[in-house]
Amino acid sequence: MEYFDNRIIRTTIFVFVVALILRTGYSYFFIDPEYLILEDQGGYVQLGQSIAKTGDFFQLTDGKHTGRLPGYPTFLAIIYTLFGENNMAVVVVQTIIDSLTCVVIGLIAKSVIPRSFLVVGMISALNLNMIIHSGMILTDTLFLFLFSIFILFAFYYLRHPARLKLFLAISFLAIATLVRPVSYFLIMLVLLLLIVRFILKRIQLKEIMYNI
């Protein structure tokens, strides 16, 4: 109940709605569908369409090899399967995801500084970089969403340790790594930090194995 009282629910809805309105407005007035296949975006679109049609993950021009990770193309393939090969549908889904990210970032701030949810959530909602990237077929929006959830559950675990919170934190970090490799080395860092925490807390080996 700590995380879901009425005030937090109202703030969550407010931040989400403001973020969604801003991102929807940007997408409606400033995004040309033809722009969504330019440069790196075209490569992701091609991979997503290929997965949706064949179920195989490879670049059509290079045989069964790819310089991309499978997370984001699979995300695109799911959208193409559900809504057809409509790149604006991708933008719509990403505007929703990015609006949720603003809420998650606000919750992260709240776990560190009480009463900061609204301020930090609104800063995220108004963040021009986030707004622009939500309207591009690139990994940024999906990765930030997944990585933010990892941080949120990591903070929740540190405050009130529970195996489910640890499992969710590690799972979202692993999924985020399938979207962008930048978080790959954090997996080992997280394990190291957990060990340090257990040592500082003087937790016995039996309890460490139980938590892990």
Annotate the PLM regions.
Residues M1-G25, K110, I199, I208-I212:
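Start-transfer (signal-anchor) and selected internal transmembrane alpha helices
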Residues A19-L22, V120-L128, I132, L152, ...:
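Short helix- or helix-capping micro-motifs
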Residues F29-G42, K53-T74, Y80-M88:
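Membrane-proximal lumenal/periplasmic loop motifs of glycosylation machinery
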Residues P70, T74, G84-V103, H133:
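Loop-to-helix entry region of an early transmembrane alpha helix in multi-pass inner-membrane enzymes
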Residues V92-P114, F145, I149, F153:
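Transmembrane-helix motifs of polytopic, lipid-linked glycan transferases
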Residues N129, G135-F143, V179:
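Short acidic/glycine- and proline-prone juxtamembrane loop motifs at membrane-interface regions
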Residues F153-A174, K206-N211:
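Short hydrophobic alpha-helices at membrane interfaces in multi-pass membrane enzymes
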